[in-house]
Amino acid sequence: MKKMLTLLLSAGLVASIFGVMPAAAAPTVVNSTIVVPKGTTYDGQGKTFVANPSTLGDGSQAENQKPVFRLEAGATLKNVIIGAPAADGVHCYGNCNISNVVWQDVGEDALTLKSSGTVNITGGAAYKAYDKVFQINAAGTINIKNFRADDIGKLVRQNGGTTFTVNMTLDNSNISNVKDAIMRTDSSSSQGRITNTRYSKVPTLFKGFASGKTSQSGNTQY
């Protein structure tokens, strides 16, 4: 009885601080790609979005699926959960900012850079990526910070066989259960840097980079 009273008092204290939490809302089903216009911000306010598999794709490894979100140059996507099916996740056309976006079950890819630019990813997470999380299809830079990834093939992959330059950085993150590598390229000019990151069950940090094109510091294997 005393234990039960303590639990009730604790629950009451939490409720008084945070208020009564409503039941989780049903995911928003996206029938056609949500376009975030140039220079604007889309704040999902923590809501979950899933693709309509009939119109966007079923989140398998099938090519040419459509994205749930399309970001035009300079756009920002934040506070979004992308559930399953995720189709082809997020497409960035030029510079884009991704803040606190979680991919619960990565589809074809979590995010693809479709035209040259810089992708800044801060916070968030990605899980269950059969192949790659972030696909880079154009010259540019991808900066990833404070990110969590688990059960993935690769974290960052430059489009296979391409020779353009991609600069990849990963900082203060936690990466685990990787099948291939954290960063992979086939380009002799691309660069990769991993700092202050914890990782576990990762075969290799870098794959395909030319000599002298990778660096690391402050990382911890666990």
UniProtKB/Swiss-Prot annotation:
The protein's role, per its UniProt record: Catalyzes the depolymerization of both polygalacturonate and pectins with low (20-34%) and high (90%) levels of methyl esterification, with an endo mode of action. In contrast to the majority of pectate lyases, displays high activity on highly methylated pectins. Does not show xylanase and cellulase activity.
Alphabetical list of InterPro entries matching this protein: Pectate_lyase_PlyH/PlyE-like, Pectin_lyas_fold, Pectin_lyase_fold/virulence
Any GO molecular function: pectin lyase activity
Signal peptide residues on this chain, from the entry's feature table: 1-26
Organism of derivation: Paenibacillus amylolyticus
Location in or out of the cell: Secreted
Primary site of residence: secreted
Enzyme Commission number, as recorded: 4.2.2.2, 4.2.2.10
Keyword Calcium tagged: yes
Highest taxon in the source lineage: Bacteria
Gene Ontology terms: biological process: pectin catabolic process
Gene assigned in the entry: pelA
Record-linked SUPFAM superfamilies: Pectin lyase-like (SSF51126)
GO cellular component: extracellular region
Catalysed reactions listed for this entry: Eliminative cleavage of (1->4)-alpha-D-galacturonan to give oligosaccharides with 4-deoxy-alpha-D-galact-4-enuronosyl groups at their non-reducing ends; Eliminative cleavage of (1->4)-alpha-D-galacturonan methyl ester to give oligosaccharides with 4-deoxy-6-O-methyl-alpha-D-galact-4-enuronosyl groups at their non-reducing ends
PANTHER family given in the database record: PECTATE LYASE F-RELATED
Keywords tagged on the record: Calcium, Carbohydrate metabolism, Lyase, Polysaccharide degradation, Secreted, Signal
Cofactors: Ca(2+)
Thermal dependence summary for this entry: Optimum temperature is 45 degrees Celsius.
Name the record gives this protein: Pectate lyase A
pH effects: Optimum pH is 10.5.
Family designation: Belongs to the polysaccharide lyase 3 family.
Pathway annotation: Glycan metabolism; pectin degradation
